[in-house]
A protein has these predicted regions:
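Ser/Thr/Asn(+Pro)-rich, low-complexity disordered segments
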Residues: 2-453
Length: 453
């Protein structure tokens, strides 16, 4: 009891604020009336179908097997090999740049590794303190918010091609939203780091992220003008907004799944998509596994994302049953030009579209994603997710971590090694044993630590 009291005392500066947010969540979710079976939420824009938990084969929490624990140890090797002296981690093996999304992935991998007892407390503390201190000292785009990319060597602002830039190239609201997830874990579970988290956030003008309750990103055009644009599409938009809401930011519009929503039929499954097309809104729009997998692993979903996520999973299983092609798709780095591909359930009006960041066809690089495979395996207990797990379980470097995926056409490994892939593998395996990352008030009582034989 004395340790609990001490932790509460350390966190008192944040508890009053977070209690208010918790009450806000209680008000929102209290308005949702659960009914067995499938129900429909009537909205002005559309009807969102809600599947009951009983109809979704969710994986039950259990201890990791010895094989799964070894997989987690393999994932951690990536971070052992790619951490710089300032605490930042390379986004790609030996590539000395990182976005805030990559840094968030590292922090969540670090928390996962510690909670799975892969690293000792002093290592966790030292790594956490080092990266938080570096984040608190980052130069900011227009002195407001973190730039889209930084050198992991110098912590200076860079372009996406890792060229140093004094001004910066803008900020990503989605990336900033993601890093709020580990920040909230630190505040609630490791309150000794609350002052450092506050030190970071006091540097950032979070109000610049929002306009009319929507997420706003910043970019720089060819003339050097700063452009402020709505950021996020179905899945990612709500995921990032959810984490920012925990910090008292009004993002009620961004959290409304129904605003730009419609279903499309993908191999007999009604999958939710975003009506905001690239030609109208000058932004790419994809349906992929990742935002729904992360929402499940980190938040345990809400009733809408739980159903939308399950539809995305079902479509991928349906493609496998129809074609015999193992399917678990997401965006991934690849080990050859163009080096980054969106392998999608649906994009630009096409099912199973694979495109580059510029929207160009990349079908020849369509892949089975390691992070999507293991993420889906962690969330859903089905014969198909077991097949995904088995297919991907040897797709790694014993020295450097998990490869990004397996190419469909050749069956060869996509040997890109990234922070994001290895972080999601760690998060997924942690989820199997300990449940969602953000579990206020019940983490300590449910924590398990010993693997099965």
């Amino acid at each position: 009891m004395s340790q609990l009291s001490e932790n509460l005392k350390k966190a008192r500066g944040s508890i009053v604020f977070l209690i208010g947010i918790t009450l806000a969540f209680g008000t929102v979710f209290g308005l949702e009336q659960w009914k067995p079976g499938k129900v429909k939420m009537m909205t002005a824009a559309n009807v969102i179908e809600i599947d009951s938990d009983a109809s979704i084969p969710l994986r039950k929490q259990r201890n990791l097997s010895s094989l799964e624990l070894d997989m987690a140890k393999t994932a951690w090797k990536y971070f052992d090999n790619n951490t710089q002296d300032n605490g930042l981690v390379n986004s790609v093996h030996n590539y000395t740049a990182a976005t805030l999304w990559d840094t968030a992935s590292y922090l969540l991998a670090l928390i996962s590794a510690y909670e799975l007892k892969l690293i000792p407390k002093n290592d966790f503390d030292q790594r956490s303190r080092l990266v938080l201190e570096t984040l608190a000292g980052l130069p900011l785009f227009e002195d407001k918010l973190p730039n889209k990319s930084y050198s992991t060597l110098s912590a200076s602002m860079t372009t996406y091609t890792n060229q140093q830039t004094e001004r910066g190239v803008g900020w990503s609201a989605i990336d900033i939203g993601r890093i709020m997830v580990p920040f909230n874990v630190y505040v609630w579970r490791y309150p000794e780091f609350t002052p450092l988290v506050e030190k970071v956030l006091l540097q950032w003008q979070l109000d610049a992220l929002v306009k009319d309750a929507e997420l706003i990103g910043a970019d720089v055009d060819e003339q050097g003008n700063t452009l402020y644009l709505q950021e996020g599409r179905l899945g990612y938009e709500e995921y990032a907004a959810k984490s920012l809401l925990l910090n008292g930011i009004d993002l009620s519009e961004a959290l409304d799944y129904s605003r730009h929503f419609e279903y499309v039929d993908i191999d007999g499954v009604r999958v939710g998509t975003d009506l905001r097309t690239p030609d109208q809104f000058d932004a790419l729009n994809f349906v992929v596994s990742e935002p729904y997998v992360l929402d499940g692993l980190e938040f345990g979903w809400d009733r809408y994302s739980r159903s939308l996520s399950y539809r995305v999973y079902q479509a991928q299983e349906a493609r496998y049953k129809k074609t015999g092609i193992m399917t678990a798709v997401s965006e991934d780095n690849i080990d050859q030009a163009p080096y980054f591909v969106y392998n999608t359930v649906f994009a630009d009006g096409k099912a199973w579209n694979a495109v580059t960041e510029k929207g160009e066809d990349a079908s020849e690089f369509r892949s089975l994603s390691s992070k999507a495979s293991i993420g889906l395996y962690a969330l859903y207990d089905t014969d198909y997710t077991q097949k995904l797990f088995n297919r991907i379980s040897d797709n790694y470097s014993s020295d450097n971590g998990w490869y990004a995926g397996i190419y469909e056409a050749s069956g060869k490994s996509n040997k890109a090694l990234t922070a994001n892939t290895n972080a999601i593998v760690l998060e997924a395996l942690r989820y199997i044993q300990l449940g969602p990352m953000i579990q206020i008030g019940r983490f300590a009582s449910t924590q398990k630590t010993s693997p099965e034989g």
